Amino acid sequence: MSKNEEPSPKYIKTENLLEKIFASRAQTRVVQHFLDRPKEFFNLSRIAKETELAHSTIHRVMQPLVDMGLIKEIRVGQQIRLFILETEQDVSKILAKFYDDIKPHLKEL
């Protein structure tokens, strides 16, 4: 693409989506945590403990992931919230496939 060409709207959407998914190191760590355990349910405290991030950080990064359709939130009663990788959305399927493909190479880095 030359300097004068405008990026296509599809490119912009994809670029923005990747920026949203990997918005911070904390959010990236949480995404990876769910990708490593795609069939497990987690509450906020367990996510914080297993990712070694502050509970307040987990609370802040979870909502954007839910809004994007990467993580599914399930409310149990009035106070308990459980989270699991959303496996039915295209964005999460593509991300999971990508992660599975690169995972063996991450150990080399």
Q: Can you name each region flagged by the protein language model?
A:
Residues 2-29:
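Short alpha-helical segments that sit at the start of domains
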Residues 35-39:
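Short helix-capping/hinge SLiMs at alpha-helix to coil transitions
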Residues 75-82, 88:
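Short, Lys/Arg-rich nucleic-acid/phosphate-binding segment
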Residues 46-49:
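A short acidic, leucine-rich amphipathic alpha-helix
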Residues 62-63:
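Short, hydrophobic-biased segments on the C-terminal half of alpha helices
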Residues 69:
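Glycine-centered, phosphate/nucleic-acid-interacting loop/turn motifs that mediate DNA/RNA or nucleotide
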Residues 90-109:
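Amphipathic alpha-helical dimerization/coiled-coil segments
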